[in-house]
């Protein structure tokens, strides 16, 4: 099977990490990138050097207005309007929408004007169908032109919640994600009219924040709709986050039994999405981990057989970006079978 030709709109954190992952992905070839705010030489620099993930494993060069990565030309566009990007010139049939701006179906559909067939939004969407690998990707039937890969936190939480709900039944639960700071936060205190706490210096503070990640699980696992909610605590680390899921379960089980159930799922149907560790790990040990969710056996606790706290790590950049591409490859496979 020939590689799936992909375009990336938005060359920020996720756009660049998706590109890096694509180089390692056997089914994907990035043939075009669009970003109106940077020129090609700067795009090459940002792809080559990364403070969290290190030096790019390969060759990055510039040829006129285009990138050349590992000897292959990657067309570089600088269009502000997605409808003006000529994806068809490069053969890009699938577009990763990673600007964080065009997150509705109507806005993301603009990519179809330039020749794209499908758009995968690398963020939650208010109206596009959301899919999480290992959870509900089998629901994709090829009919939607625009889909969402949900958020990095939902990708961590949903596989874990699925295993617990399938085996024990979740009555209700609360989630907290202890989340690294992101590009939307401030390096020092600055104006943030909609979120006053969010305007405080990211590297100086622990900042309580909101997240829709837990409620979004109800969209990908309808049986959990209304049973989960959560919050975020932004902390002074640049990458890697951790989910704390506290649930009341219907079918009583010891923490050890629950652990064995999670391990069985991680070694079986959810391999590559859900993983586990019994080591005394810290956040930096998870840097570059390609799994969506890494269950920390030693970090969790239970109060009794029906009330348990589970802890799971995720590289909110690398693991999530790999899932974007895995979902894209799955979508392309389903589309090809139609």
Curated annotation (Swiss-Prot):
Gene3D superfamilies documented for this protein: Dihydrodipicolinate Reductase, domain 2, NAD(P)-binding Rossmann-like Domain
Recorded metabolic or biological pathway in which this protein acts: Carbohydrate degradation; glycolysis; pyruvate from D-glyceraldehyde 3-phosphate: step 1/5
A GO MF label: NAD binding
Keyword NAD: yes
Record's subcellular location: Cytoplasm
A GO cellular-component term linked to this record: cytosol
Keywords of this entry: Cytoplasm, Glycolysis, NAD, Oxidoreductase
UniProt EC number: 1.2.1.12
GO biological process: glucose metabolic process; glycolytic process
Binding, NAD(+): 13-14, 35, 80, 316
Residues of the active site: 152 (nucleophile)
Broadest EC class assigned to this enzyme: oxidoreductase
Residues that, per the record, bind D-glyceraldehyde 3-phosphate: 151-153, 182, 211-212, 234
Protein activity control: Inhibited by koningic acid through the interaction of cysteine residues with koningic acid even at very low concentrations.
Pfam families (alphabetical): Gp_dh_C, Gp_dh_N
Residue numbers marked as site, Activates thiol group during catalysis: 179
Reactions performed catalytically: D-glyceraldehyde 3-phosphate + phosphate + NAD(+) = (2R)-3-phospho-glyceroyl phosphate + NADH + H(+)
Assembly: Homotetramer.
Note from the entry: This protein is a koningic acid (antibiotic)-sensitive GAPDH isozyme. It is present only when no antibiotic is produced.
Similarity comment: Belongs to the glyceraldehyde-3-phosphate dehydrogenase family.
NCBIfam families (alphabetical): GAPDH-I (TIGR01534)
Name listed for the protein in its UniProt record: Glyceraldehyde-3-phosphate dehydrogenase 2
Organism, as annotated: Trichoderma koningii (Hypocrea koningii)
Name of encoding gene: gpd2
């Amino acid at each position: 099977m020939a590689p799936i030709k992909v375009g990336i709109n938005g060359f920020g954190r996720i756009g660049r990490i998706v590109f890096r992952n694509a180089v390692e992905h056997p089914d994907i070839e990035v043939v075009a990138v669009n970003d109106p705010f940077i020129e090609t030489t700067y795009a090459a620099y940002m792809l080559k050097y990364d403070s969290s993930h290190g030096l790019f494993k390969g060759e990055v060069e510039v040829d006129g207005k285009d990138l050349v990565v590992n000897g292959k030309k990657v067309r570089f566009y600088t269009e502000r309007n997605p409808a003006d990007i000529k994806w068809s010139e490069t053969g890009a049939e699938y577009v990763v929408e990673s600007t964080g701006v065009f997150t509705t179906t109507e806005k993301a559909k603009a990519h179809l004007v330039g020749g794209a067939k499908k758009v995968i939004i690398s963020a939650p969407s208010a109206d596009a169908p959301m899919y999480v690998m290992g959870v509900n990707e089998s629901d994709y039937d090829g009919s939607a032109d625009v889909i969402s890969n949900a958020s990095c936190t939902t990708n961590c939480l949903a596989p874990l919640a699925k295993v617990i709900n399938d085996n024990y039944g979740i009555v209700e639960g609360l989630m907290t994600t202890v989340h690294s700071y992101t590009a939307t936060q401030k390096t020092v205190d600055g104006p943030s009219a909609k979120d006053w706490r969010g305007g405080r210096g990211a590297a100086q503070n622990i900042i309580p924040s909101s997240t829709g990640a837990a409620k979004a699980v109800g969209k990908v696992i309808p049986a959990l709709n209304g049973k989960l909610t959560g919050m975020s605590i932004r902390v002074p680390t640049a990458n890697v986050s951790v989910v704390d899921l506290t649930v009341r379960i219907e079918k009583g089980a010891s923490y050890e039994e629950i652990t064995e159930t999670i391990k069985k799922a991680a070694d079986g149907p959810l391999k590559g999405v859900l993983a586990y560790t019994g080591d005394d790990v810290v956040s930096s040990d998870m840097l570059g981990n390609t799994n969506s969710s890494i269950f920390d056996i030693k970090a969790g606790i239970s109060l009794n057989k029906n009330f348990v706290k589970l802890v799971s790590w995720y590289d909110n950049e690398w693991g999530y970006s790999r899932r974007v591409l895995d979902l894209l490859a799955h979508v392309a496979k389903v589309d090809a079978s139609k």
